Amino acid sequence: SLLAQSDPEFRMVFLIGRSLPDLWRDRLAAAIAPLEGARLVALPTLPHYMAIKRAYAMATPETASHVTGFRLDDDDAIDRDHIARMRATVAALLPVAGLEAPLVTGSNRGFFLERKPEGNALFEVVEKTPIGLGLAMTTRVGVSENIFRRNHRFCGQYYNTYTDANTPAFIRTVHADNDSDPHASGKIERADWDSAAPLIAQHFPFDAAMLQRL
């Protein structure tokens, strides 16, 4: 989904441990090679938040006054216009929210793709509290906080927070290897594949048939 963004002007750090075998590091490097602004960074063992802060610093342009960073796991997807919409939203809201205060932006509406041996299931979701997938924080350069600082569900308690409830903006993959509880905080309904297919094709760089086979 990163390669399909309508706005390609962004930087992405792929953070790995130095113990990752060369075979898999080379495979990852080849996979991200077509992505402009991508950078593969291997760090020694560190507390998670410290490693994230280092990665953010490496991706920040020297001339920037503010930086916007967002969360994305390797088994999830964002819609084609995520970067463009995030940029426009931040440009509109930051002057109102204040240039010095962190601003959190994201999306509430999307899909959960549940992988099952008997056949994958699709659920349409409208979250009540912010989902981490694609959630972004904008701060002044040099501010130590980023979007990983707090539990994403509680962002509205700590930061000015805006989430879009209209656009299908994410697909979260639910499977046995998830390291967090993949539950929805709000509305969740089983989706019919045929009915969901047009929305998936409109907003994402793959089709419903591919998701069924995944």
What are these model-predicted stretches?
Residues 24-34, 121, 184-191:
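Short, aromatic/basic amphipathic alpha-helical patches
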Residues 17-71:
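Active-site-proximal specificity loops/subdomain of glycosyltransferases
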Residues 20-24, 79, 113-115, 179-182:
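Short catalytic/ligand-binding loop motif for oxyanion handling, primarily in non-cytosolic enzymes
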Residues 10, 37-39, 102:
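Short, conserved active-site loop motifs that form the nucleotide-linked donor/cofactor pocket
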Residues 47-62, 70, 77-161:
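Conserved catalytic core of nucleotide-sugar-dependent glycosyltransferases
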Residues 12-14:
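Hydrophobic/aromatic residues located in beta-strands of well-ordered beta-sheets
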Residues 128-214:
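C-terminal catalytic/acceptor-binding lobe
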Residues 1-9, 34:
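Short, acidic, metal-binding catalytic loop of nucleotide-sugar glycosyltransferases
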